[in-house]
Design a protein with these regions (language model features):
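Bacterial Sec-dependent N-terminal signal peptides
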Residues: 1-22
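Alpha-helical scaffold segments in carbohydrate-active enzymes
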Residues: 31, 63, 83, 128, ...
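Inter-helical turn/loop segments and adjacent helix faces that build the functional surface
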Residues: 68, 169-180, 239-251, 304-312
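Extended ligand-binding groove/face enriched in aromatic
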Residues: 75, 86-214, 220, 332, ...
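Oxyanion-binding "anion nests"
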Residues: 233-282, 286
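Short, surface-exposed patches at the edges or C-terminal ends of soluble domains, predominantly
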Residues: 390-638
Length: 638
């Protein structure tokens, strides 16, 4: 049943997606980079300010970079943030004393920039925003005030503005005490703002009951505003993505997400798949279908399903919503520019002039084309929906990355010793973050093994990836491959495992012990070095791909530098050569397969588009290698 649902959803999605060469996300991103070339700055008389709107857009741009490996998206993110962040990490136009939780959102982009570039200014700027949360005024319960000028008020919007950044910072830098606080923000918001009859949440809650918009008994605003609900849903999913799975409040957040999704599903417009601005009053005079909220609901639900936080039965809600967005809101003008119409520019509570939260107030706000919040939400939704057709390729399969034979450790900027070099969560040059995204785009779970491989440890792995086994230069106390380790891996391969060996050249890895393993499959890495590259003379690392290569069927050229030669004997065979130098080798053993090459060549530096010329198709090759490896996984029962 689940399989048939998935197939029908994918078929429907493929009908909806435009036949144009560029996907909707790419066309919308082109509009973004045309309208806002270096920030949300279009009028010289009104210089751009540090604002959450930009963070919404840049999260969408970030997702496109992850999916395409095209450096123009990363460069755009960096250019936008550099417009505000100086070399010392100060943020232009930002005032911590405002205690405006909206201002925290862009911290997520700062964390990405620091993780990728290691430039300290981004860490310093992100830490300024983290420090704001340390002293942010709170309700008596402990919830963050939305702004200093809105005392004792929690708005649904604020959960998206603050909590995903708070979670990412805490996860990255080991602030374990923060997770209970983060969970409580959602728990308190739901307890205070959720309508028990409909499951919907009111836009705002005033603990003091002093605001004119607040019900004197409950403190709640009068209406269910769609975008406020949508911000809240996006926040739940983005927080869960980085929230410790074993934390005592993880289940609490998941249950809140389920209640949220149930409520949203019930008020989806059955005709268009979209959602109205005042979400529960579709027939009210002047009410309209709204683009930003619809995009956010689609993104939140689709992402929650992809990450396993919601069952697949919710996916048709996202699919129907996305089809409606493409039909009702996305348009191309005479110049060929893609635009998003139908986003309400703003809706709030209180302030000056005073916003009373009435239905008439919500209907009075302007609905505009290419509003940053709507465009950013659409980009994020499109990133989720455009990956959907490939997610079923290897659903339920797992790739296990070795962190035992390659167990390098390094102190991070806080002085904490952490695993580094070819790790799933590393975004700097030497990490495998983008490669991990490639595998996950096909439904493969990415996990790590930090102990010796045993029958039990390997039992749930379909693919086992060992990269750049340590020598003493890498690790003073390396875990060398032992005969017992080699035997365990050999037996696992024979039973149907897919082993991937990405080695290195002389001086950069252990050869003596690692070959104990490789030799068992007829593959021997020689302690030498070829494909030398001097500076940016990339030609030295060029490897031409002949037509019809079984692993890389559509690439013409890849880049591998400083690799060792490989000697083969039965059962191993070459899959790719450069002259007489073996580049790719494979071996079949029992039900299993081994793939080997003498370079960790798919680390971020050579797939993220920022360094090597585009003629070297390493990012595309990562996708084709992943698909080839998935095909080698035996079908159960055969």
């Amino acid at each position: 049943m689940k399989k048939s649902i998935c197939l029908s959803i994918i078929a429907l999605l493929m009908q909806v997606i435009s036949v144009n060469a560029q996907q909707p996300s790419e066309r919308m991103a082109a509009t973004v980079m045309s309208i806002w070339k270096d920030s949300l700055y279009t009028d010289p008389s009104k210089p751009a300010k540090w604002t959450y709107d930009q963070g919404v857009i840049l999260k969408g741009i970030e997702g496109l970079w992850y999916r395409t490996g095209d450096a123009k998206y990363f460069n755009y993110m960096q250019k936008c943030m550099d417009f505000f962040v100086d070399d010392k990490g100060n943020i232009r136009t930002y005032k911590a004393s405002d205690y405006n939780i909206d201002n925290v959102l862009c911290g997520r982009i700062l964390l990405t920039l620091f993780n990728v570039t290691n430039k300290e200014k981004y860490f310093k700027a992100a830490t300024i925003l983290r420090d704001q949360l340390r002293t942010q005024p709170r309700t008596n319960q402990g919830g963050f005030w939305h702004k200093k000028i809105y005392p004792y008020q929690m708005w649904l919007d604020g959960l998206y503005m603050g909590e995903p950044f708070y979670t990412e910072y805490a996860t990255t830098y080991g602030d374990t005490a923060a997770f209970s606080d983060i969970a409580h923000q959602f728990i308190w918001m739901e307890n205070n703002a959720r309508d028990k009859k409909t499951g919907l949440l009111y836009h705002g809650w005033d603990e003091s009951r002093q605001q004119k918009w607040a019900d004197p008994k409950t403190g709640l605003s009068p209406h269910f505003w769609a975008r406020a609900m949508a911000w809240y849903g996006m926040a739940l999913v983005d927080v869960l993505e980085n929230f410790p799975a074993n934390h005592k409040y993880n289940d609490s957040i998941r249950l809140i997400l389920h209640r949220f999704a149930d409520a949203v599903k019930k008020v989806q417009d059955p005709k268009t798949g979209l959602w109205y601005d005042i979400i529960n009053l579709p027939a009210a005079k002047g009410n309209y279908l709204e683009a930003s909220a619809s995009s956010m609901f689609v993104c939140a639900i689709a992402k929650a399903v992809r990450l396993g936080f919601l069952p697949s039965s919710y996916l048709p809600v996202a699919q129907k919503g996305y089809a409606g967005i493409l039909k009702e809101f996305l348009e191309t003008d005479a110049s060929g520019q893609t635009n998003l119409k139908g986003t309400v520019s703003v809706s709030g509570l209180g302030g000056n002039p005073y916003r009373d939260g009435s239905y008439a107030y919500y209907m009075s706000e302007k609905v505009i084309v290419n509003d940053a919040k709507g465009v950013g939400a659409f980009l994020q939704a499109a990133n989720e929906m455009e990956v959907l057709p490939t997610l079923g390729l290897a659903k339920g399969k797992t790739i296990l990355l070795d962190d035992y034979f390659n167990a390098e450790r390094k102190k991070d900027i806080t002085g904490t010793l952490k695993p580094f070099h070819y790790k799933w969560n590393e975004w700097n040059n030497g990490g495998f973050a983008l490669l991990g995204n490639v595998f996950r785009s096909y439904g493969v779970a990415t996990k790590t093994l930090s102990t010796a491989p045993t029958k039990i440890n390997l039992a749930k792995a379909d693919i086992y990836l060992i990269v750049d086994a340590d020598n003493v230069a890498d690790n003073p106390t390396p875990n060398y491959v032992q005969p017992k380790d080699a035997e365990e891996i050999y037996n696992w391969v024979k039973a149907g495992g897919v082993l991937v060996l990405l080695h290195n050249d002389k001086g950069n890895a252990d050869f003596e012990h690692f070959n104990i393993l490789a030799d068992k499959f007829g593959i021997h890495f020689n302690e030498d070095s070829y494909n030398k590259v001097i500076g940016n003379e990339f030609e030295g690392g060029k490897v031409d791909i002949p037509s019809g290569n079984p692993v890389l069927p559509s690439e013409k050229k890849i880049y591998q530098k400083e690799i060792s030669s490989i000697t083969l004997k039965s059962p191993a065979k070459a899959l790719l050569k450069k002259d007489e130098l073996v580049i790719f080798a494979t071996a079949k053993l029992g039900k299993g397969t081994v793939f080997a090459t003498a370079d960790p060549w798919l680390y971020n530096e050579y797939v993220d588009g920022r360094k090597i010329p585009a003629e070297y198709e390493n990012f595309k090759a990562a996708h084709d290698l992943a698909k080839w490896l998935i095909k080698q996984i035996p079908i159960k029962g055969k």
